[in-house]
Amino acid sequence: MTTPSRRRLMRDFKKLQEDPPAGVSGAPTEDNILTWEAIIFGPQETPFEDGTFKLSLEFTEEYPNKPPTVKFISKMFHPNVYADGSICLDILQNRWSPTYDVAAILTSIQSLLDEPNPNSPANSLAAQLYQENRREYEKRVQQIVEQSWLNFGENEGDAVLKDDVEIEEIAAPGANDADDDRMDEGASGSNA
């Protein structure tokens, strides 16, 4: 059964595929359109430049009337990111609007990387260093940027980069299993 929430998420996914914002990528997991994986690339000319950061987005059937729960999966050192990866961002809380879509959420988080709000800290050490010792703050950010290179492509981030995922396949899992089986047979039978 397709609910309004699921239809909206299918539209959000289609929009992300057809008109992707610079530096962000996201897709539903293979078996659940309410669970997404995303990648945010660190904005250029910022301490986060060249970083590749994985996130998870958990939607409910109340989306778009209620925001998703968004967390960094990648390690993050930022004034507005809690130790568990949860993000302190007004549009994900008290300033949420149903007009926001997945692209807007991801680009807002990407902007937050460069423009933290140290007055509303989720990580007090990061906020303090950002305000009082920018050099040490940037050194710690560089460490997580380098760590993001080592961890990229492991486990959960792989589905995000698939360009061939069809919306119908996500909405109706298993619909294309026969195609997948044929592809697997062809791959295992080839002599390289």
Curated annotation (Swiss-Prot):
GO terms for biological process: DNA repair; proteasome-mediated ubiquitin-dependent protein catabolic process; protein polyubiquitination; protein ubiquitination. Disruption phenotype: Worms are viable, fertile, and do not show any obvious anomaly. Keywords: ATP-binding, Nucleotide-binding, Transferase, Ubl conjugation pathway. SMART domains: UBCc (SM00212). It catalyses: S-ubiquitinyl-[E1 ubiquitin-activating enzyme]-L-cysteine + [E2 ubiquitin-conjugating enzyme]-L-cysteine = [E1 ubiquitin-activating enzyme]-L-cysteine + S-ubiquitinyl-[E2 ubiquitin-conjugating enzyme]-L-cysteine. The keyword Transmembrane does not apply. Residues 4-150 form the UBC core domain. Residues 1-28, 171-192 are annotated as: Disordered. The active site is at 88 (glycyl thioester intermediate). Pathway: Protein modification; protein ubiquitination. Its EC number is 2.3.2.23. InterPro entries: Ub_conjugating_enzyme (IPR050113), UBQ-conjugat_E2_core (IPR000608), UBQ-conjugating_AS (IPR023313), UBQ-conjugating_enzyme/RWD (IPR016135). GO terms for molecular function: ATP binding; ubiquitin conjugating enzyme activity; ubiquitin protein ligase binding. One of its GO terms (cellular component) is HULC complex. Belongs to the ubiquitin-conjugating enzyme family. Interacts with ubr-1 and rfp-1. Interacts with ubc-13. Catalyzes the covalent attachment of ubiquitin to other proteins. This is Ubiquitin-conjugating enzyme E2 1.
